[in-house]
Swiss-Prot record:
Superkingdom of the source species: Bacteria
Transmembrane regions: none
Quaternary data: Homodimer.
E.C. designation(s): 4.3.3.7
UniProt subcellular location: Cytoplasm
Organism placement in taxonomy: Bacteria, Pseudomonadati, Pseudomonadota, Gammaproteobacteria, Pseudomonadales
Protein name: 4-hydroxy-tetrahydrodipicolinate synthase
Function (record text): Catalyzes the condensation of (S)-aspartate-beta-semialdehyde [(S)-ASA] and pyruvate to 4-hydroxy-tetrahydrodipicolinate (HTPA).
Disulfide-bonded cysteines: none
InterPro entries: Aldolase_TIM, DapA, DapA-like, Schiff_base-form_aldolases_AS, Schiff_base-form_aldolases_CS
Gene transcribed to yield this protein: dapA
Pathway where it operates: Amino-acid biosynthesis; L-lysine biosynthesis via DAP pathway; (S)-tetrahydrodipicolinate from L-aspartate: step 3/4
Family that this chain belongs to: Belongs to the DapA family.
SMART domains associated with the record: DHDPS (SM01130)
Site positions for Part of a proton relay during catalysis: T44, Y107
Record organism: Ectopseudomonas mendocina (strain ymp)
């Protein structure tokens, strides 16, 4: 079972927007050393929308090769084209990914039936474990619990990243699906509470900069040690909030640059973190002990 703290890994870039393979390797080592339980390569935090297909697969391949089976690698292969999602999912399987994460199609706003058929088609086309990803605040496409329930009956659809931050919604999903269907948080601030309801982990932005703390948080929550998990979460809350001072992954890439783990590259239409946000994010990092 894929569970625990799963980092939504950024994709490091140089100042011209080219992929920085040395920094990628450094980040993967950082997570292997700091207790991250799984790596999500080229999800939406990894700027999947602005990588071409060749770059997308090369990042996944390099992460898979470096991890070498020590922890699961989940490949982000979702998008708003069903055909392209099939292509990416098939390629991710070929380079050795353990599972794929598929965001709901953005912009084109499919109906619930369209969502069902989209994900069913990908699952039938590629025999690899697949995790649904619902983040309506970014996609303007909300996959309702009844649609999740229908999709959960497809053998290789194994779980969902529920990133609404709505615990009532998460509870409804948990109530509708079988016990072996994995429900993950995609919202760092509410992840502890979702796991205490029965969720199996957190696909995390904060884990990029505080992997050990997020791993400890997830382990405590999944053991049912609510007081310990909540105490860690309270300590991390300033960071959870500061990492969304601007659109993700702008703040988290700046934070990693500040920590000396990567350069200062990001791709348009995203831009580097605004100067007015530097000190608030720096202060949050210091509060949480990730920056001296």
């Amino acid at each position: 079972m894929i569970a625990g703290s799963m980092v939504a890994l950024v994709t490091p870039m140089d100042a011209q927007g080219g992929l920085d393979w040395e920094a990628l390797s450094k980040l993967v080592d950082f997570h292997l050393q700091e207790g991250t339980n799984a790596i999500v390569a080229v999800g939406t935090t990894g700027e999947s929308a602005t990588l071409d297909v060749g770059e997308h697969i090369e990042v996944i391949k390099r992460v898979v090769d470096q991890v070498a089976g020590r922890i699961p690698v989940i490949a982000g292969t979702g998008g708003n084209s069903t055909r392209e999602s099939v292509e990416l999912t098939r390629a991710a399987k070929e380079v050795g990914a353990d599972a794929c994460l598929l965001v709901t199609p953005y912009y084109n706003k499919p109906t619930q039936e369209g969502l069902y058929l989209h994900f069913r088609h990908i699952a039938e086309a590629v025999a690899i474990p697949q995790i649904l990803y619902n983040v309506p605040g970014r996609t303007v496409c909300d996959m309702l619990p009844e649609t999740v329930e229908r999709l959960s009956k497809i053998d290789n659809i194994i779980g969902i990243k529920e990133a609404t931050g709505d615990l009532q919604r998460a509870q409804e999903v948990l109530d509708r699906v079988s016990k072996d269907f994995l429900v993950y948080s995609g919202d760092d601030a509410t992840a502890v509470e979702l796991m205490l309801l029965g969720g199996k982990g957190n696909i995390s932005v904060t884990a990029n900069v505080a992997p050990r703390a997020m791993s400890d948080l997830c382990a405590a929550a999944m053991r049912g040690e609510a007081a310990i998990a909540r105490a860690i979460n309270d300590r991390l809350m300033p960071l959870h909030k500061a990492l969304f001072l601007e659109s993700n992954p702008i703040p988290v890439k700046w934070a990693l640059h500040e920590m000396g783990l990567m350069g200062d590259g990001i791709r348009l239409p995203l831009t580097w973190l605004s100067p007015r946000c530097h000190e608030p994010l720096r202060q949050a990092m210091r509060q949480c002990g990730v920056l001296a």
